[in-house]
């Protein structure tokens, strides 16, 4: 059964370590009982970087619980749940199955898959594993963002009723391969650009990819980047 394992929210906090200092809301805690979901997500959930997080196309962040075992095994880590700032930890479905536009009915809410999560250096920093964000990106199992089509209530243990939302099926895993793969697939990118439910920010990134414009992900993956030494600082 596809279901919600946990619901989480968090506040903005200062983090310092490994030569880095930043604000983050990655440290989320379990929300017990029934949780109200608005068009903006969970009322008591906050984002430190409101340029890259939050907003109607990123109302909630979803991550598959099954991926934790793979990450811990591959990188020899022991991780708390949640570890990556997700709002919904789910079981029974993952990024290889969830597609852009898919509709998720959870509790009394109606949610829609809008785009993959794009991992950043803060995930690596707080867990003391420099390779973590890049590992997410390379595997393609990044988790995804949801928009709220109909506000309502949900809670841990709720079953997820999952329906296809677009005639053309492109999974979160496939989108990540398009974004980060060495080869450009113009046909698949054009199929994605035709989807009505694709998030505008993802649409813009895909157009750059199609045009052959190189997107420098080093700052996102490693933080401040020193061009003279070509190392993150």
Model-identified regions with their sequence ranges:
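Glycine-centered loop/turn positions within well-structured domains
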Residues: 69, 142, 152
């Amino acid at each position: 059964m596809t279901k919600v394992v946990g619901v989480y929210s968090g506040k903005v906090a200062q983090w310092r370590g490994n030569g880095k200092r930043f604000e983050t809301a990655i440290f989320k805690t379990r929300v017990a009982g029934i949780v109200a979901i608005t068009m903006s997500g969970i009322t008591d959930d906050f984002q430190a970087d409101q340029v890259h997080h939050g907003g109607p196309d990123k109302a909630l962040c979803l991550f598959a619980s099954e991926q934790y075992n793979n990450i811990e095994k591959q990188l020899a880590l022991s991780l708390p749940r949640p570890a990556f700032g997700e709002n919904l930890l789910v079981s029974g479905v993952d990024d290889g199955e969830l597609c852009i536009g898919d509709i998720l009915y959870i509790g009394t809410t109606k949610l829609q898959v809008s785009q993959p999560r794009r991992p950043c250096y803060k995930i690596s920093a707080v867990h003391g594993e420099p390779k973590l964000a890049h590992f997410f990106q390379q595997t393609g199992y990044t988790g995804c963002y949801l928009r709220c089509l109909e506000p309502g209530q949900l809670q841990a243990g709720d079953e997820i009723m999952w329906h296809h939302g677009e005639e053309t099926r492109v999974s979160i895993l496939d989108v990540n391969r398009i974004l980060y793969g060495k080869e450009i697939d113009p046909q698949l990118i054009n199929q994605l650009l035709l989807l009505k439910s694709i998030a505008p920010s993802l649409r813009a990134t895909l157009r750059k990819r199609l045009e052959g414009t190189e997107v420098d992900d080093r700052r996102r993956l490693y933080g401040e980047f020193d061009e003279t030494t070509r190392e993150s600082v």
